[in-house]
Amino acid sequence: MTTKFLYWHWEEFYDKKQIKTIHDLIQDKSYTKEDPDLAASPYEDGTPRKVVDTQLVNYREIEYAIRGIIDEAYTICLTQFGYTAKLPTNDDLHYNTYTSRKKSRYDYHIDEARENTHDYKLTLLINLSPKEYEGGDFYLFSSGNMMIPELKKPGSAI
């Protein structure tokens, strides 16, 4: 299937109240922090690509709060990109918190599985920041870097 889109976006899918509800739910239901050794592979010199606080939360625990965007993403995944995808309900979601104080960043990387039995076909990013921020631009690489401005708005998703 040929697609005319590199990505899809939903601007301000969640309002400030919903963002706070989801954030609070993740704080309550998160069960651990991501092991840095299991995060994105470091650069050849050992410098980490990912310097971010990442909490893990089971999808089942917050499904009711994010079901709307998940359903939208499944529909777009099928109708616009030609993939039939279904998130296993026992999968973990990553909640990344970026701060200027810690000089957080997640450098260029490719989303792929470490195992040969499966690979990622769909990544959904939701901006759950309670307010607008500077920096932290998100780029896709497709014949050159392309900034995705829609993700800057709180409550938006790509």
PLM features per residue range, with description:
Residues 1-86:
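Non-heme Fe(II)/2-oxoglutarate
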Residues 67-71, 75-158:
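Catalytic core of non-heme Fe(II) oxygenases with the double-stranded beta-helix
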